[in-house]
């Protein structure tokens, strides 16, 4: 890192034995390429446009569009353009799940190139001199969905993890250490999960206490923001960052992904601790030296999902770390005006070990790891996740209503 810069540049810290990510600059953060305090955003946009010009993204679309009807043979296995096609294949081939599980199509990217997303707040969208660039970038981002296919997978009941990993209870920190997935219980006192102020006042505190109780040796837990998911919500969905109001999401992320990676896990933690950036929770005020000391010890990013009612359609599904620990992740760059964030995608493997919580109850909390600072391979670095469609439910089954809170846990 360099303290002379206006922007913190994270050191690239790969897991021992992990292949290099599929990323620009060999995985080095774009914030290394700062120009006049822009945190590398100009170079990131230039690279996004160069990649569009190269045609590699269009080549993936052409491969799918020009393939004959039916299954598409990929290097990873048979993929399908549509959910229904993949489901028919699962049923025709008698692909079955164990008790409590579900055989299901899941949507993966088949593009082995980094992707770029210029966020809506970026000034590029309002610059008349860059209208042509904006059109190209918008089209390419929309085309990302055309670079995905459905693949058959099996979900296992996360409550029964001990059947698949003898001696490992899903209700323990050991499950998070090994798999990147755990379960917990919470009888929340929060009465209105659509009231962001009540959520931040009541539920954040409950989740921080849960995390400190759950992880032996944890010294601090900071819940910093949340999302609400409810397709059927009839009220105002508007997000208001200034008021710390996340709004209400009508859509569910139907693509295998993770929210953080080797770079962004450190960046997100540091910008919270030093700037309270996008922090909806309790405010913190650490000096740079104090943050360096805090981040020199182990810390993790954990997402916690709690339903408002029994989950039926669009359940949240989680993948266990050992089944993809040796697999390179693919970077997605989120370009703001003042920083370049990073999330990740993954290509399909039939060996991916997926879990869900069938009919997850309002007092059941599913937890997934988005980042762990331990890189020696002794613990999981992260999980990845997606929403999915349960084909065994009627068409009018209600969609998931839940909260997802994001946190950092420090040791």
Please state what every model-predicted region is.
Residues 3-43, 47-50, 58, 62-65, ...:
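Non-heme Fe(II) oxygenase catalytic core, chiefly the N-lobe of the double-stranded beta-helix
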Residues 1-4, 405:
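Generic low-polarity alpha-helical segments
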Residues 342-411:
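Catalytic core of Fe(II)/2-oxoglutarate
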């Amino acid at each position: 890192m360099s303290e002379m810069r206006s922007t913190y540049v994270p050191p690239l810290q790969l897991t021992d034995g992990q292949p290099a990510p599929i990323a620009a600059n060999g995985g080095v953060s774009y914030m290394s390429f700062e120009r006049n305090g822009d945190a590398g955003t100009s170079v990131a946009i230039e690279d996004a446009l160069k990649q569009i010009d190269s045609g590699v993204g269009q080549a993936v679309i052409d491969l799918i569009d020009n393939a004959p009807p039916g299954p598409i043979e990929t290097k990873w296995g048979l993929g399908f353009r549509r959910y229904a096609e993949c489901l028919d294949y699962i049923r025709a081939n008698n692909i079955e799940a164990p008790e409590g599980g579900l055989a299901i199509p899941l949507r993966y990217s088949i593009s082995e190139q980094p992707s770029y997303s210029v966020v809506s707040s970026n000034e590029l969208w309002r610059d008349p001199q860059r209208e042509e660039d904006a059109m190209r970038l918008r089209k390419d981002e929309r085309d990302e969905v055309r670079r995905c296919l459905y693949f058959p997978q099996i979900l296992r009941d996360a409550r029964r993890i001990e059947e698949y990993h003898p001696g490992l209870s899903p209700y323990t920190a050991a499950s998070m250490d090994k798999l990147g997935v755990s379960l917990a219980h919470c009888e929340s006192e929060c009465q209105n999960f659509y009231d962001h102020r009540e959520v931040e006042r009541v539920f954040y505190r409950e989740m921080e206490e849960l995390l400190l109780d759950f992880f032996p040796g944890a010294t601090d837990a900071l819940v910093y923001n949340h999302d609400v998911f409810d397709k059927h919500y009839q009220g105002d969905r508007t997000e208001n960052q200034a008021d710390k109001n996340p709004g209400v999401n009508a859509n569910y992320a139907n693509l295998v992904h993770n929210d953080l990676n080797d770079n962004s896990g450190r960046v997100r933690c540091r910008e919270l601790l030093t700037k309270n950036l996008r922090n909806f929770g309790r405010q913190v005020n650490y000096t740079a030296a104090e943050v360096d000391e805090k981040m020199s010890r182990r810390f993790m990013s954990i997402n916690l999902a709690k339903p408002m009612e029994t989950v039926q359609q669009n359940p949240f599904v989680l993948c266990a770390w050992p089944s993809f620990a040796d697999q390179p992740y693919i970077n997605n760059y989120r370009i703001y005006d003042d920083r370049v964030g990073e999330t990740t995608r993954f290509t399909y493997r039939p060996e991916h070990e997926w879990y869900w919580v069938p009919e997850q109850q309002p007092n059941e909390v599913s937890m997934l790891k988005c980042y762990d600072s331990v890189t020696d391979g002794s613990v999981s670095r992260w999980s990845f996740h997606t929403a999915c469609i349960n084909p065994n439910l009627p068409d009018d089954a209600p969609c998931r209503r839940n909260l997802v809170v994001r946190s950092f846990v420090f040791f």
